């Protein structure tokens, strides 16, 4: 069974993810990124998809043109786990050149 983060673990781990925000009404985090164009956005999504498949942990996401919205939560644990933190850190590195979406 996957360990859901405690309130204290969640607080500590999320301090290292300042670009992510809590999803109202869910134990989940979200981030939106804006790229130069669709090709950049799709390339980013491809890199994340490869990592997610390696981790067997898949994001909820939505893409329109150059914008990618991502939500992370672990369904098996009904909330945030270390897997979400690991994937969020990878997403931050992979999307380092992106702008925050408004």
Swiss-Prot record:
Q: Name one GO biological process term.
A: tetrahydrobiopterin biosynthetic process
InterPro entries, alphabetically?
A: PCD_sf, Pterin_deHydtase
Known catalysed reaction(s)?
(4aS,6R)-4a-hydroxy-L-erythro-5,6,7,8-tetrahydrobiopterin = (6R)-L-erythro-6,7-dihydrobiopterin + H2O
Q: Which UniProt keywords apply?
A: Lyase
One GO MF term on file is: 4-alpha-hydroxytetrahydrobiopterin dehydratase activity
Question: Recorded E.C. number(s)?
Answer: 4.2.1.96
The entry's family comment says:
Belongs to the pterin-4-alpha-carbinolamine dehydratase family.
- PANTHER family xref list: PTERIN-4-ALPHA-CARBINOLAMINE DEHYDRATASE
Its protein name is Putative pterin-4-alpha-carbinolamine dehydratase
Organism (species): Burkholderia lata (strain ATCC 17760 / DSM 23089 / LMG 22485 / NCIMB 9086 / R18194 / 383)
Q: What is the lineage of its organism?
A: Bacteria, Pseudomonadati, Pseudomonadota, Betaproteobacteria, Burkholderiales
